[in-house]
């Protein structure tokens, strides 16, 4: 089983075509097909099936792909770690970040990291727990920065707390309940449920339950934090969002934070990674910069 063949299989799965994968890998299509055939012979199972739209993974291929990605990732990380320990600070870091930290500590952390390690390539993706779990497991992500509840985190993941996110209730500036001080005053309002580790609207639903109130009235579900401020600014909906998102969005002048005296659940932001898959020295350095700036801005 050759590493290059596993890389080729991953490429085929990503582009969905033998021809396109062969071009990207600078191989002839017959040579690529022969390599995949040899891998299938070794595994004694078909990995790919041809369709009208190209090629796709069989059930065997889907099962094997998780292992292929992990093998390729661990091989790359091992090479990068040895190189970094020898003083050659190159390589790649891929991680996911939730909106709260992406707007606050992350820009400063990335700038500091780039000054220290200018030759390390960083790839940042949007992502929240638990959606990021499969990519953490197969090694696609080195780590994730996301809100989570400690008891909900899978046991194969290591969770290192960064800070507690400050959550606020937000509505358009002229909202009738703009000056409300108690959750009970918001019972008749409609809500835009945003994504959360325990499902859309979990924060406000938990808050209502804590104070013995009925379920909040659902107006819509908005899983895009980028769209959420604009949706609320042009409607009568209320929503919850991290204070950093409320204070740093294009619709800030059209929004208000409801001055509640009742406490809201404030989720913890964690660094999540596989506990049995150590990060490279460069990734550890980036995490240290994130921790440093999170303490200042969280």
UniProtKB/Swiss-Prot annotation:
GO terms assigned for molecular function: DNA binding; DNA-binding transcription factor activity
Asked if the record carries the keyword Transcription regulation, the reply is yes
Pfam families linked to this entry: HTH_1, LysR_substrate
- Keywords per UniProt: DNA-binding, Plasmid, Transcription, Transcription regulation
Membrane-crossing segments per the record: none
Determine the domain of life of the protein's source.
Bacteria
PROSITE patterns this protein is in?
HTH_LYSR
Q: Which residues bind DNA?
A: 18-37
Could you give one GO CC term from the UniProt record? cytosol
**Subunit annotation:** Homotetramer. Dimer of dimers related by a twofold axis.
Its function?
A: Regulates expression of the tsaMBCD1 operon and of tsaT in response to p-toluenesulfonate (TSA). Acts by binding directly to the promoter region. Binding to the tsa promoter depends on TSA concentration.
Q: Which family does it belong to?
A: Belongs to the LysR transcriptional regulatory family.
| Name of the molecule in the record | HTH-type transcriptional regulator TsaR
Lineage of source species: Bacteria, Pseudomonadati, Pseudomonadota, Betaproteobacteria, Burkholderiales
The protein's gene is named: tsaR
């Amino acid at each position: 089983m050759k590493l290059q063949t596993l890389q080729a299989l991953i490429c085929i799965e990503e582009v969905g075509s033998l021809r396109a994968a062969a071009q990207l890998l600078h191989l002839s299509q017959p040579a690529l097909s022969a390599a995949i055939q040899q891998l299938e012979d070794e595994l004694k199972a078909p990995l790919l099936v041809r369709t009208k739209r190209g090629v796709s993974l069989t059930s065997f291929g889907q099962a094997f792909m998780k292992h292929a990605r992990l093998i390729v990732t661990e091989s790359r990380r091992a090479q990068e770690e040895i190189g970094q320990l020898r003083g050659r600070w190159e390589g790649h870091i891929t991680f996911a970040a939730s909106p709260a930290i992406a707007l606050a500590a992350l820009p400063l952390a990335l700038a500091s990291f780039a000054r220290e390690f200018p030759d390390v390539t960083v790839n940042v993706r949007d992502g929240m727990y638990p959606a990021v779990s499969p990519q953490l497991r197969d090694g696609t992500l080195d780590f994730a920065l996301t809100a989570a509840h400690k008891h909900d985190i899978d046991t194969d993941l290591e969770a290192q707390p960064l800070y507690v996110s400050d959550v606020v209730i937000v509505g358009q500036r002229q909202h009738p309940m703009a000056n409300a001080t108690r959750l009970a005053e918001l019972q008749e309002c409609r809500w835009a449920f945003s994504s959360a580790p325990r499902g859309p609207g979990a924060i406000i639903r938990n808050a209502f339950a804590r104070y013995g109130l009925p379920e909040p009235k659902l107006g819509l579900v908005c899983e895009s934090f980028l769209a959420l401020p604009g949706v609320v600014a042009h409607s009568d909906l209320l929503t919850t969002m991290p204070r950093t998102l409320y204070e740093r969005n294009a619709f800030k002048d059209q929004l208000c934070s409801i001055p509640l005296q009742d406490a809201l659940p404030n989720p913890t932001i964690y660094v999540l990674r596989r506990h049995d898959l150590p990060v490279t020295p460069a990734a550890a350095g980036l995490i240290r910069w994130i921790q440093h700036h999170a303490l200042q801005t969280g």
